[in-house]
A protein has these predicted regions:
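Flexible coil/loop and intrinsically disordered segments
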Residues: 1-221
């Protein structure tokens, strides 16, 4: 999808809405160990019952220190999402990191994070969220190149390249189409002439959450 308007920072929003942010922070506080299925845990409709089970806020089982710890984690997470992770906008994504938006390293991180974001769901966002928070809790505001390398390494370890025969339209793994788009963007200067129409397309590419492989494939430059 082309960036038709450069006002990419206008009306940006957090990558996680508040109910999902609460659940992500709770999941991290619990050491990613829960009872039952993860799909049931990450359902906003179950928010109150989940907190009543894992972090009681009323009655005799209330632990004030646990609640205080959770609130501190919540503040850190929200700051991390505002500064160190992409924020969706009307035209694409913005990324702060206290750097100029023309910084090449920032662009690399933005594209990697946007690929991770669109290829995740409400039930798998915990992967990139915890990868991010590991770095933030270790370094505070991570170096942009260090954060990029860390996220990419964890992505590669989490999703190693499958065998060639598995990468076909007969499968239903949209992830690898997004990943291919990321690699094309990453190696664009090697693949396309700088003044070619193809380079213009790749330079302005924006990752989108598409619902079908048929929708994704034609977007690949």
């Amino acid at each position: 999808a082309p960036k038709n308007d450069r006002e990419i920072n206008k009306n940006s929003r957090c990558s996680l809405n508040f109910p999902y942010l609460l659940l992500q922070v709770l999941y991290r506080k619990l050491g990613r160990k829960i009872n039952g299925k993860i799909n049931d845990f990450f359902k906003p409709n179950n928010l109150l019952s989940i907190f009543e089970e894992y972090l009681p806020f009323k009655g005799s089982k209330v632990n004030k220190e646990d609640i205080k710890d959770f609130m501190e984690m919540l503040v850190r997470a929200r700051l991390a999402l505002d500064i160190c992770f992409i924020r969706p906008t009307e035209y694409g994504y913005s990324l702060d990191m206290n750097l100029n938006e023309d910084n090449e390293s920032l662009k690399n991180l933005l594209m990697l994070q946007s690929m991770l974001y669109v290829s995740s769901s409400n039930y798998t966002n915990y992967r990139w969220f915890n990868w991010l928070m590991d770095e933030v809790e270790r370094y505070g505001l991570p170096d942009v190149n260090l954060l990029y390398s860390s996220l990419k390494k964890k992505m590669d370890n989490e999703s190693p390249l499958p065998e060639y025969k598995a990468l076909t339209y007969s499968g239903d793994n949209r992830y690898w189409f997004w990943r291919l788009d990321f690699y094309i963007w990453q190696h664009r200067k090697e693949l396309f002439h700088k003044d070619s129409p193809e380079m213009t397309i790749v330079e302005n590419y924006v990752f989108k959450r598409n619902r079908s492989i048929e929708h994704i494939a034609p977007q690949t430059p």
